[in-house]
Amino acid sequence: MSTKIKGELFPSRSLVSKKWTFLLCFGSFCFGILFTDRMWIIPESKDMPRPSVSTEAERLKLISEGCDPKTLYQKEVNRDPQALFGEVSKTHNAIQTLDKTISSLEMELAAARSAQESLVNGAPISNDMEKKQLPGKRRYLMVVGINTAFSSRKRRDSVRTTWMPSGEKRKKLEEEKGIIIRFVIGHSATAGGILDRSIEAEDKKHGDFLRLDHVEGYLELSGKTKTYFSTAVSKWDAEFYVKVDDDVHVNIATLGETLVRHRKKHRVYLGCMKSGPVLSQKGVRYHEPEYWKFGENGNKYFRHATGQLYAISRDLASYISLNQHVLHKYANEDVTLGAWFIGLDVTHIDDRRLCCGTPPDCEWKAQAGNICVASFDWTCSGICRSADRIKEVHKRCGEPENAIWKARF
């Protein structure tokens, strides 16, 4: 076969004849039809449900069982109000149980973070902490931290001979009643100096100190309080943590009985609640350098527990431990603690038995059967000349000597 171009003949360059072209096209067409039919055929399955029939059957089943939407609505309208109230109560109880569980988990998380922080900072975890992390750990009722200073040796001795059990009795108090009592003190500006060595010798004799990683100083009481709660909650697992000054008389059994009444409550902040003026004038006692944060001159502080004695529950102590690096400190320690809680959902409990006066006030109340938890003189922010007078206060206002051993917590 040839092709004529401009009068010349050339041989054909077609490689495929018309016959072969026709056969290839026809074969491709047939293959395409076969493939298309295979793709679009829907296989019949015995297991595949028929939507319309199944939906109708389920609807009929629901109606037969009394679950028709109209029937359910009518039941809700005609339901007994008392039954509804019962269900609401059950739901409320379930929510409370869940809230307790969440609080427990939060406390365990805070304790775990405190332990982790101790490891990161290179501080060894105490034996008490190790025991606390084991299954069946000991839960104490309360930890009582007695705030003291290097110069208060006479006050400490007077406390040991009055309301604070010493020696074997103190150990028995811990084992049988779950009450920990310690004098709380940090270290001097020159660590390892004569003041620190004096405390170490006293602690070796009595074994009743809780040493803090804190530099002692009157203007550092807010920081000391924060460090105390953070240290105590990581060292002992207790329901309550108490702070008291070393010039205050305390009836331990009455304190324990008071706290037990609030053990089912969450985020407890207990003390003698007060509100005083914000002092902006320099040079006066209780001057507040950041007075401008509390509003105009003449304003008063928000309600907070007086600093002589107060108690907080474990969840609040854990909160302080967890957030200690961001909690702001004001000049006055009791105001500072109240400020940490002012924005939280805290249960404030005002109990005036925590701030009785010295005799005759606390004596009259004791004779009437209303024994005070704590006694001190407001004019001195503690018992005036406490080292000399606390024995008299204990004699006239103290609970019976065996009260703590008869108490059930």
Swiss-Prot record:
Record Pfam families: DUF4094, Galactosyl_T
Keyword Transferase recorded: yes
Domain of life: Eukaryota
Pathway recorded for this protein: Protein modification; protein glycosylation
Cellular-component GO terms for this entry: Golgi membrane
Keywords, sorted A to Z: Glycosyltransferase, Golgi apparatus, Manganese, Membrane, Signal-anchor, Transferase, Transmembrane, Transmembrane helix
Subcellular location: Golgi apparatus membrane
Membrane topology: Single-pass type II membrane protein
Co-factor requirement: Mn(2+)
Enzyme class: transferase
Transmembrane segments: 20-42
This enzyme's EC code(s): 2.4.1.-
GO biological process, one term: protein glycosylation
InterPro entries for this protein: DUF4094 (IPR025298), Glyco_trans_31 (IPR002659)
Gene Ontology MF, one: hexosyltransferase activity
Keyword Transmembrane helix: yes
Family (UniProt): Belongs to the glycosyltransferase 31 family.
Entry function: Beta-1,3-galactosyltransferase that transfers galactose from UDP-galactose to substrates with a terminal glycosyl residue.
Protein name (record): Probable beta-1,3-galactosyltransferase 3
Species: Arabidopsis thaliana (Mouse-ear cress)
Gene: B3GALT3
